[in-house]
Swiss-Prot record:
Its EC number is 2.7.2.11. ATP binds at K10, T169, D170, T211, G212, G213, M214, S215, T216, K217. Pathway: Amino-acid biosynthesis; L-proline biosynthesis; L-glutamate 5-semialdehyde from L-glutamate: step 1/2. This is Glutamate 5-kinase. Residues 275-353 form the PUA domain. GO terms for molecular function: ATP binding; glutamate 5-kinase activity; RNA binding. Belongs to the glutamate 5-kinase family. Catalyzes the transfer of a phosphate group to glutamate to form L-glutamate 5-phosphate. It is found in: Cytoplasm. One of its GO terms (biological process) is L-proline biosynthetic process. The keyword Transferase applies.
Length: 367
């Protein structure tokens, strides 16, 4: 790929700490140097940084605290300001300004908030400012889980309209087996499409300070590739890794973007975490997959979770297959009432209606 590129670089806690209990500042300095070099060459760089909790623990002198959500939020609240200050100081050496964006998944679930976040991201990039993104762990609850910043980096890549997403980790890439305990494990260099076989070999490599594993990196790669973004998983310790990815030099594992990426308005649907799920019968499944039809209430067998009209939900088959992500036209209570009924009965059952379909085909993304 030639010309100016937009690259999102995700740095996990294991990369920022080198597997220790404190931030490895010497290594972070080197990564900033690489980013600054590419920035000076005309490329647009976005940083997705983990490490707030590790920075907070370090600043407080490594207290022995219970491993609870409240403790993680406490450490994140203390560490986040330290972390952004570090990024700001290091990039300022090269005359580069940074702009902090703290996000939660809720910013991606709502279309208006998604567009606002996208506009902020692109304004920063248009003014040669490096966005530094982290999850707002100090207020998030369910968000502090395995894979948050992996998946967040894919969403950041979508917001930035990125060309590539680089997931830096403590492994050289995706292997055929866990290289830590299998000497025959081989590095997978190229991936065209993520399937169940790949998912089954993606073992976890979670450090004590972070919340990410290889399986969540596959999830992030899937989201980004379907949005038309190439993804590379590589070792953060590899010299010149950021420049290599920009220059299309083979490094780590490269996931190629799909040939027909999702249209822009559907990006947020695919990236948003489902607020609930519905199970459809075989007739509805066939209509959705083979004829591209909308989902009628008649085909709904089961509704799980509590969600509002307009939220993203998961559609499953009777066999448990994850069929689609979609925006529902009715809330969960209404769907439970009209499930299995003909569309003509909606108004009679509910006393109102938002149309004859539960999910319109234009608001559905097939997995």
């Amino acid at each position: 790929m030639s010309g100016s590129q937009t690259l999102v670089v995700k740095l996990g806690t294991s990369v920022l700490t080198g597997g220790s209990r404190r931030l490895n500042r010497a290594h972070i300095v080197e990564l900033v140097r690489q980013c600054a070099q590419q920035h000076a060459a005309g490329h647009r760089i976005v940083i997705v940084t983990s490490g707030a909790i590790a920075a907070g623990r370090e600043h407080l002198g490594y207290p022995e605290l219970p491993a609870t959500i409240a403790t993680k939020q406490l450490l994140a609240a203390v560490g986040q300001s330290r972390l952004i200050q570090l990024w700001e100081q290091l990039f300022s050496i090269y005359g580069i300004h940074v702009g902090q964006m703290l996000l939660t998944r809720a910013d991606m679930e709502d279309r208006e908030r998604f567009l606002n976040a996208r506009d902020t991201m692109r304004a920063l990039l248009d003014n040669n400012i490096v966005p530094v993104i982290n999850e707002n762990d100090a207020v998030a609850t369910a968000e502090i889980k395995v894979g948050d910043n992996d998946n967040l980096s894919a969403l950041a890549a979508i917001l930035a309209d990125a060309d590539k997403l680089l997931l830096l980790t403590d492994q050289a890439g995706l292997f055929t087996a866990d290289p830590r305990n299998n000497p025959d494990a081989e590095l997978i260099r190229e991936v065209n499409g993520i399937n169940d076989a790949l998912r089954s070999i993606a073992g976890d490599s979670v450090s004590g300070l972070g919340t990410g594993g290889m399986s969540t990196k596959l999830q992030a790669a899937d989201v980004a590739c379907r949005a038309g973004i190439d993804v590379v998983i590589a070792a953060g310790s590899k010299p010149g890794v950021i420049g290599d990815v920009i220059a299309d030099i083979s490094v780590g594992t490269r996931f190629h973007a799909v040939d027909a990426p999702l249209e822009s308005r559907k990006h947020w649907i695919f990236g948003a975490p489902p607020a609930g799920e519905i199970t459809v019968d075989d007739g509805a499944l066939s209509a959705i997959l083979e004829r591209g039809s909308s989902l009628l209430p008649k085909g709904i067998r089961r509704v799980e979770g509590n969600f509002s009209r307009g939220e993203v939900i998961r559609v499953r088959s009777l066999a448990g297959r994850d069929v689609a992500h979609a925006v529902t036209r009715y809330n969960s209570d209404a769907l439970r009432m009209i499930a299995g009924h003909h569309s003509q009965q909606i108004a009679e059952i509910l006393g109102y209606e938002y149309g004859p379909v539960a999910i319109h085909r234009d608001d559905m993304i097939i997995n």
